[in-house]
């Protein structure tokens, strides 16, 4: 008797029999009889689906081509007009002038050919706008978010950009370059939300997030290209001020604080050295006038116009980072060019995270459908534009993030072309003409799972009532001390210590008047005076020393370290004798000491008991009192 396997081997031998055998083997999969048996227990039965690629005799699916054209331009206000949302429809016959980020005019290409290929993305099954908004709002409140049921995740296979095709990558880059377009003409902007017509307000075009909507011929695929950071260096030109605020919110460890001197501070969440309030950071990021909030509203309005279309996202620089955050939120294919590393803000926005993934390291997440193109000479893309003398720092940008979500597609322009790292290579026009068009092939995309942002920083959470928590107080179960310091110092309090108590002390009062001060004390003879106090004390001992001959010494020129530099003066008393009196005046003193004048003397007879006195005086003394420059008149 033949076994089933032997029967199958004998039947499926010829070529015609192989086709018939394959159809027979696929019948259990496509036939409803196997699944609809009528029993309740069979309803939850899961049978693995065999992909057509796994069958060797079926052809592989080739990338499909799409031809995209500009259909709409959306503008969402962020700072001056946070409720502003306008739409400009572009007709095929509309003439559009495109200006690049550096002001150069470009010839507008009405059509862009892009190919697609299947892409696997892990995302939520329920991605309705109202459901996602509720989850994002609850994620900012841990108490509410913890009570929600776990969302249902799935890995969907949907058409995405063919990142291995050079033409596709090049045209997507051109779409992001065209996203820097100014107002294309005199067409009328329509209000998307709200009854307020703010089009008459001057300057609204320079405030907000601008996205360009491209659609293929069948409207089956939509591409949203978001505008990135303006090229102006300082404030006041285009949307540079707003872009700088968002850049420092998104890509710095703590709002541009605790780093370089020129970084623009955009919030007050810094607590101490390398310590930051993460609750304050999240609150600053999700405010309604920020770009991420504007991108969510823009996506909601685009999907309202095209509810059944597949949406792709593209962007350059800040626009690329915002596109990536939006793609992580809704599970959309994303292609960015020279995008700022966005894993850091992705970990702070409360984005939905699949089970088994660390929310603090979104760069380790798989099946994101995000691809970030860039080259090694761009310090913004590589995450190195944060030194003290870097262009970003001098312009006020705090670019501390270095990790990308999804996969990185890096052109090694430093190694292959010998480029030097510089901010000038960040512009999208340079990337298009000097990088993408110059290379024959596109680089291989790889994930960046081992990267870490802000490794030296510590982040803590607060209740959200204060941007910076008050000073903490430390209590001990064995000792409690309360003190108020009015003069804090570097290593403690500088206030004087006050002690309350009853003590009995012996009071000793010393009064001294120094007539001859020296460098390290007084040179006067020591005089001691003792005043007895009321407290009993030992009997004082007073010692008096009587000199046989009193001597009085007066020093006019004290020395540096003690002693006297005056010339010696001698007084001698001799009874029953008389001697002449001699007076000497030096008019030519020596260089160091002595006198070069001839010796002169005057004799004056005196009475008995007289003495010989010699007086030498000097008005100006130099070299520590050893020489005389100006003799004093006598």
UniProtKB/Swiss-Prot annotation:
Cytoplasmic compartment spans: 1-15
Residues covered by region (Disordered): 526-552
Listed transmembrane segments: 16-36
Domain of life: Eukaryota
Catalytic residues as annotated in Swiss-Prot or TrEMBL: 317
UniProt entry keywords in alphabetical sequence: Autophagy, Endosome, Glycoprotein, Hydrolase, Lipid degradation, Lipid metabolism, Membrane, Signal-anchor, Transmembrane, Transmembrane helix
PANTHER family recorded: LIPASE ATG15-RELATED (PTHR47175:SF2)
Similarity remark: Belongs to the AB hydrolase superfamily. Lipase family.
Protein name: Putative lipase ATG15
Gene: ATG15
């Amino acid at each position: 008797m033949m076994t089933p396997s032997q029967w199958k081997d004998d039947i499926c031998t010829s070529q015609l029999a192989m086709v018939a055998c394959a159809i027979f083997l696929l019948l259990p999969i496509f036939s409803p009889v196997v699944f609809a048996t009528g029993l309740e227990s069979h309803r939850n039965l899961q049978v693995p689906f065999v992909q057509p690629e796994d069958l060797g005799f079926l052809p592989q699916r080739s990338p499909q081509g799409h031809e995209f054209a500009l259909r709409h331009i959306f503008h969402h206000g962020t700072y001056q007009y946070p409720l502003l949302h306008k739409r400009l429809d572009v007709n095929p016959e509309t003439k559009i002038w495109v200006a690049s980020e550096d002001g150069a005019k470009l010839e507008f290409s009405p059509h862009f050919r892009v190919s697609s290929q299947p892409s696997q993305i892990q995302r939520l099954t329920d991605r309705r706008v109202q459901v996602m908004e509720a989850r994002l709002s609850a994620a900012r409140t841990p108490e509410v978010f913890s009570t929600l049921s776990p969302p249902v995740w799935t890995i969907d296979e949907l058409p995405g950009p063919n990142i291995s095709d050079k033409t596709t990558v090049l045209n997507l880059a051109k779409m992001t370059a065209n996203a820097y377009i100014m107002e294309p003409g005199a067409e009328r902007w329509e209000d998307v939300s709200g009854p307020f017509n703010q089009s008459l307000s001057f300057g609204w075009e320079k405030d907000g997030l601008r996205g360009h909507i491209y659609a293929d011929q069948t409207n089956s695929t939509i591409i949203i290209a978001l505008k990135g950071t303006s090229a102006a260096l300082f404030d006041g030109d285009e949307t540079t001020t707003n872009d700088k605020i968002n850049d420092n919110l998104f890509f710095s460890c703590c709002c541009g604080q605790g780093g370089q001197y020129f970084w623009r501070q955009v919030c007050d969440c810094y607590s101490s050295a390398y310590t930051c309030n993460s609750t304050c950071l999240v609150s600053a990021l999700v405010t309604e006038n920020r770009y991420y909030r504007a991108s969510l509203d823009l996506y909601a309005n685009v999907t309202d116009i095209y509810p059944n279309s597949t949406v792709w996202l593209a962007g350059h620089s800040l626009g690329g980072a915002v596109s990536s955050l939006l793609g992580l939120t809704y599970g959309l294919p994303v292609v960015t060019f020279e995008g700022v590393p966005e894993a850091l803000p992705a970990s702070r926005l409360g984005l939905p995270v699949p089970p088994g993934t660390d929310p603090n390291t979104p760069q380790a997440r798989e099946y994101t459908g995000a691809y970030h193109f860039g080259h090694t000479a761009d310090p913004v893309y590589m995450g190195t534009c944060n030194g003290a003398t870097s262009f970003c720092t001098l312009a006020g940008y705090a670019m501390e993030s270095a990790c990308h979500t999804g996969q990185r597609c890096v052109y090694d322009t430093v190694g292959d072309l010998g480029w030097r790292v510089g901010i000038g290579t960040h512009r999208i026009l340079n990337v298009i003409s000097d990088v993408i068009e110059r290379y024959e092939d596109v680089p291989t995309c790889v994930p960046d799972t081992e990267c870490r942002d802000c490794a030296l920083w510590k982040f803590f959470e607060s209740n959200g009532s204060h941007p910076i928590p008050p000073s903490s107080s430390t209590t001990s179960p064995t000792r409690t001390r309360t003190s108020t310091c009015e003069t804090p110092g570097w290593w403690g309090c500088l206030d004087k210590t006050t002690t309350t108590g009853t003590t009995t002390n012996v009071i000793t009062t010393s009064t001294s008047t120094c007539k001859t001060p020296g460098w390290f004390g007084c040179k006067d003879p020591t005089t001691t005076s003792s005043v007895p106090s009321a407290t009993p004390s030992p009997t004082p001992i007073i010692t008096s020393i009587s000199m046989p001959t009193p001597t009085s010494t007066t020093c006019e020129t004290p020395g540096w370290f003690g002693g006297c530099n005056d010339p010696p003066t001698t007084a001698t008393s001799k009874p029953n004798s008389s001697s002449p009196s001699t007076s000497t005046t030096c008019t030519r003193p020596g260089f160091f000491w002595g006198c070069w004048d001839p010796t002169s003397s005057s004799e004056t007879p005196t009475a008995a008991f007289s003495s010989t006195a010699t007086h030498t005086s000097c008005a100006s003394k130099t070299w520590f009192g050893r020489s005389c420059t100006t003799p004093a008149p006598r």
